[in-house]
């Protein structure tokens, strides 16, 4: 990995990421290799590792054959924005579960937000919500807190907030 990364990105790059199962020893060893070979202090400015996602309590893996693919959920008629909300309900660094029940909750949340979309909110109120949303996401991409903020603001949601939600999280309401 270090050879590929440094070949494509150079001796230092902003972010290296992967699953939490790769943090040690894989990423630590590849960073040590690159740092020794290139004589740099750090190969990446930041290391980001995502938690594992289980399906109904069992870690998803190719060997178990229990992988859930977003494109297959979409092809089955599930709303891509609801799929995102289901994943965003847990913090990216935490191990978390995925299930039909969690996806159904996300679909209900999305439907509630869409139903409550209103233009009756002042621009100042909407801007305040968007500013809070940005601050929450800037704090280690805290998507569970962001969703909580948006649940509280859903009745006050207008097009400004909807546009920010699409731009920041890729969720269309």
Give the ranges of each region predicted by the language model.
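Hydrophobic packing residues in well-ordered alpha-helices of helical domains and bundles
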Residues: 106, 126, 162-165
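Extended alpha-helical coiled-coil "stalk/arm" regions
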Residues: 119-132
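Basic, alpha-helical terminal appendages of large translation-related enzymes
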Residues: 135, 144-173
């Amino acid at each position: 990995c270090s050879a590929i990364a440094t070949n494509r990105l150079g001796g230092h790059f902003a972010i290296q990421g992967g699953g939490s199962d790769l943090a040690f020893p894989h990423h630590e060893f590849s960073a040590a290799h690159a740092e020794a070979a290139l004589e740099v202090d750090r190969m990446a400015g930041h290391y980001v590792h995502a938690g594992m996602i289980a399906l109904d309590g069992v870690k998803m893996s190719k060997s178990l054959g229990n992988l859930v693919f977003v494109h297959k959920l979409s092809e089955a008629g599930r709303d891509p924005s609801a799929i995102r909300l289901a994943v965003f309900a847990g913090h990216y660094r935490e191990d978390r579960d995925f299930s039909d029940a969690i996806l159904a909750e996300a679909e209900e949340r999305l439907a509630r937000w869409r139903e409550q979309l209103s233009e009756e909110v002042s621009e100042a109120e909407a801007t305040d919500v968007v500013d809070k949303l940005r601050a929450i996401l800037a704090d280690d991409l805290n998507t569970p807190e962001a969703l909580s903020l948006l649940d509280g603001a859903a009745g006050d949601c207008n097009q400004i907030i909807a546009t920010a939600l699409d731009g920041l999280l890729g969720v269309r309401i």
